[in-house]
Amino acid sequence: MNGSQQICFTDSAGKALFSIPDSGLLCLFYGNGDRHFAVCHRLDDTHAEIDGVNYSLPDFAKRMKHNQISFAPA
């Protein structure tokens, strides 16, 4: 894969939040104070493999919002 490709994360409404490079790290912040780092691989403009699971990026944001997990570049 091209290392210059970016993964553009959005909020649950589809508004762009930030981008990370392909194979970059995402930090997940849980309500109990725990943090988890996930490796992200770009699949296409709207899909990524996050911690080994394929997601549509808008669906990932909705799932994180539902589970009260915030996320940011690591």
Annotate each PLM feature.
Residues 1, 7, 24-27, 38, ...:
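Generic low-polarity alpha-helical segments
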Residues 1-17:
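Mixed-charge, Lys/Arg-rich low-complexity intrinsically disordered regions
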Residues 21-54, 58:
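Acidic, low-complexity, intrinsically disordered interaction modules
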Residues 53-74:
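Intrinsically disordered, low-complexity, charged/polar segments
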